UniProtKB/Swiss-Prot annotation:
Gly residues compositional bias, start-end: 281-300
TPR repeats, residue ranges: 114-147, 149-181, 183-215
The keyword Phosphoprotein belongs to this UniProt entry's keyword annotation: yes
Subcellular location per the Swiss-Prot or TrEMBL entry: Cytoplasm
GO CC annotations on file: cytoplasm
Region (Disordered): 38-98, 256-300
GO molecular function: protein dimerization activity
Signal peptide coordinates: none
Residue span(s) of domain STI1: 319-358
Ranges of compositional bias, category Basic and acidic residues: 49-73, 256-272
UniProt protein name: Putative protein FAM10A5
Keywords recorded for this protein, A-Z: Acetylation, Cytoplasm, Phosphoprotein, Repeat, TPR repeat
Modified residues (N6-acetyllysine): 353, 360
Length: 369
């Protein structure tokens, strides 16, 4: 595998650990399904991701966008993280080294031959012949690909050749075979140090010393640890500031939701009051309905002080169309207008909803005084 791709994958995994919501995007569905199919469990999305998923997008205000961008900019103290990069090199991009066939059936003869190759590799290594040592360790690995120390030894040579990615690949394989061996952690820590991966280097070197104390590993740990701690502190400050901003945003969202709820309640209350005011003739039209409606409500003379006691009212209220019209604010406004000034009837001659109700009332009460 291309070492650059491996580094990109490592960075992606680190990002997922810091923010699991990355895995809950639609683009990452295939990865979630694969992890779950292998028996793994995808961490739940962060609260922020859930809230963003459940919130409809609104057209942003340009001023607010500018303020948000400024708020998202880390302070100079946090953004200007200066780390001494002395000794850091560019990553190696050679083709992956031969790793052997882990499924091969190993005989005693092959194990003996692998051991001979290892001894020969150590001898040429002591003579400074690094590439020849790599070749001999590779031969030993192909003969016995399930011996962790062979990968660790070859990794040590890759570190000396300043090929940290190749060394990391060997150490990863050695740790898979024997996770209790200190050597792979030591050399992987040194490889990470060459790449400027201070946190990873500190972790591996510390773990190597924990498994089997080594002065060389301890000395390098003392070198990288302050840088790793500085980075960790930087991220703590950033995350703390990020969390504070999230809390403020959450408070603002709650406040806005409360205001929206209160506004909706006020509007609902206003609608109820409006409905009560223009409801089905409570207490009659103000001032009654003097005289006859112009334009034809025959026999509907006199005032209408109230409809509660009017004969036939229950029948009218049981008529769905009439009841719906009485609950229509537009119709009831028209009735109030006509009640105050019957001459205004002419304004509603072309309104079928108003005239339909008038026709029903005229038919029902036309002959009653």
């Amino acid at each position: 595998m291309d070492p650059c791709k491996v580094n990109e994958l490592r960075a992606f995994v680190k990002m997922c650990k810091q923010d699991p919501s990355v895995l809950h995007t639609e683009e990452m569905r295939f990865l979630r399904e694969w992890v779950e199919s292998m028996g793994g469990k995808v961490p739940p999305a962060t609260q922020k991701a859930k809230s963003e998923e459940n919130t409809k997008e609104e057209k942003p205000d340009s001023k607010k966008v500018e303020e948000d961008l400024k708020a998202d900019e880390p302070s100079t103290e946090e953004s200007d993280l200066e780390i001494d990069k002395e000794g850091v090199i560019e990553p190696d991009t050679d083709a992956p080294q031969e790793m052997g066939d882990e499924n091969v059936e190993i005989t005693e003869e092959m194990m003996d031959q692998a051991n001979d190759k290892k001894v020969a590799a150590i001898e040429v290594l002591n003579d400074g012949e690094l590439q020849k040592a790599i070749d001999l360790f590779t031969d030993a690995i192909k003969l016995n690909p399930r011996l962790a120390i062979l990968y660790a030894k070859r990794a040590s040579v890759f570190v000396k050749l300043q090929k940290p990615n190749a060394a990391i690949q060997d150490c990863d394989r050695a740790i898979e075979i024997n996770p209790d061996s200190a050597q792979p952690y030591k050399w992987r820590g040194k490889a990470h140090r060459l790449l400027g991966h201070w946190e990873e280097a500190a972790h591996d070197l510390a773990f190597a010393c924990k498994l089997d104390y080594d002065e060389d590993a301890s000395a390098m740990l003392k070198e990288v640890q302050p840088r790793a701690q500085k980075i960790a502190e930087h991220w703590r400050k950033y995350e703390r500031k990020h969390e504070e901003r999230e809390i403020k945003e959450r408070i603002e969202r709650v406040k806005k939701a409360q205001e929206e709820q209160e506004r909706a309640q006020r509007e609902e209350e206003a609608r109820r009051q409006s409905g009560a005011h223009y409801g089905p003739f409570p207490g009659g039209f103000p001032g009654g309905m003097p005289g006859n409606f112009p334009g034809g409500m025959p026999g509907m003379g006199g005032d209408m002080p109230g409809m509660a006691g009017m004969p036939g009212l229950n029948e009218i209220l049981s008529d769905p169309e009439a009841l719906a019209a009485m609950q229509d604010p537009e119709v009831m406004v028209a009735f109030q207008d006509v009640a105050q000034n019957p001459a205004n009837m002419s304004k509603y001659q072309s309104n079928p909803k108003v005239m339909n109700l008038i026709s029903k009332l005229s038919a029902k009460f036309g002959g009653q005084a």
